[in-house]
């Protein structure tokens, strides 16, 4: 899960991931404190989601991180509603919006479209959690509490 972004099938695959990764990490570092934590969280969460729900195939490359960063940066601007994240969201969408949509379409078996999707889900969840930590806690809290027995059960 953690080493997947470091493994690539070819030099072309490495270059195809490296260029957007440099741009997206630059945008992340310029707009967020502790950007390295966000990147690691996307790698781990996206990798876990892919491990649970992904196809039985070899998933290589930094696509989980790339797609996670795209969605994180775009939705971060939407959720946070602050000037810098909004500008970063617009720049990210202009640069990578088309790639984002096309990346979810399974075109060949060599492309991990499900890795793209899992990275995007991780990025979206982290963007929401960062902007609304209390709301996420409120939504998850009922799932962790034991429910009292229903009253009037005749006992």
Task: Pin down the residues of each PLM region.
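Long, low-complexity, intrinsically disordered segments
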Residues: 149-155
